[in-house]
Amino acid sequence: MNSNKKKGLTAASLIVLLLIIDQAIKLAVKLNMTLGESIHIFDWFQIEFVENNGMAWGMELGSKLFLSFFRIFAVVGLIWYVRGRIKKGARMAYIVVLSMICAGAAGNIFDSLIYGQIFPASTPYYIEGAVPSTLTTWGEGYAPMLMG
């Protein structure tokens, strides 16, 4: 196997692996934690259940549908860019970093595509004794496709 094919296979495998890990963690949090709850892992690391309506830090630029289409465009562009960098012989470390960014962006597309369809809306208020979210019948969640 030549070097470019090896890099391409590594990039694709890393993206798929990170997407699986990302979704497994998000589903575990959504199904086992209440909004605002946190789990202490180390002094410097905790998992906290927060929900974000927009982009990073809750920024909102236009509608959720616009954001979803922007994400799709960005992931397609990033995959095209990674492919081009592989063909030009970029270092593996650079390909790995780009693949990680691509996996994160693709995970956000999956979230907006699916989560609004399968989960009820989370309450922003702490309710004593609240139970974690449950799955709903497909299409009966809190938002239409690409707007979750």
Cite the ranges covered by each PLM segment.
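Alpha-helical transmembrane bundles and membrane-interface segments of multipass inner-membrane proteins
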Residues: 1-148
